[in-house]
Amino acid sequence: MVIVALTGMPAAGKGEVAEIAQQRGWAVHRIGDLVWEETERRGLELAPSSVGTVANGEREAHGYGIWAERSLPCINALRTDGKHVLIDGMRGEKELAVFRDAYGDTLVTVAVLALSETRLERVQQRDRVDDGDAAAFHARDQRELGWSLAETIEAAAKTLENNGSLSQLRENADALLEQLESR
């Protein structure tokens, strides 16, 4: 069994890779779902500013690995079926450290890479509550880079380029996941 921690900038294509993993029978845990749940629990709207405030506030209050720590019970529950697991949305070095401590050699980090212009186009085309406009997109990029996201992307063991078509990403992601399944 392998555990993949997926990282990348917003709208790079992590969700698409997670969907492909699910189609292959992998279990998927999306870290962002925990942030959304906490935002809703506080009675806040799922808007870019409130989701970002909650994510950042929890990191400042409890440490930058907090969302990974809160993810461990969910991930461990998914592992009981013996399935491969994909963690969607690892955001920084502290989260990576939590996952490495928990899963050791079974963990493989994968970065999904896409140009800023490509990602902005995708944000403007998709209908996600936490995306917002171009200004919100750039603010989110800066906020997430402040969580050491760039360093986490650079440290990834594997990369998936996603500046082409969706079918190209699907083909490349499928091939990478197949390769990781045979580890």
Please describe what each predicted stretch is.
Residues 1-4:
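Extreme N-terminal starter segment of soluble prokaryotic enzymes
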Residues 9, 21:
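P-loop (Walker A) phosphate-binding loop of NTP-binding proteins
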Residues 12:
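ATP-binding Walker
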Residues 15:
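Walker A/P-loop
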Residues 27-98:
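ATP-dependent small-molecule kinase phosphotransfer cores
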Residues 28, 109, 158-161:
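Short, well-ordered beta-strand core segments
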Residues 65, 125-179, 183:
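Small-molecule kinase domains that catalyze NTP-dependent phosphoryl transfer to phosphate-bearing small molecules
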Residues 88-89, 102-130:
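Conserved phosphate-donor/acceptor-positioning beta-strand/loop module used by diverse small-molecule
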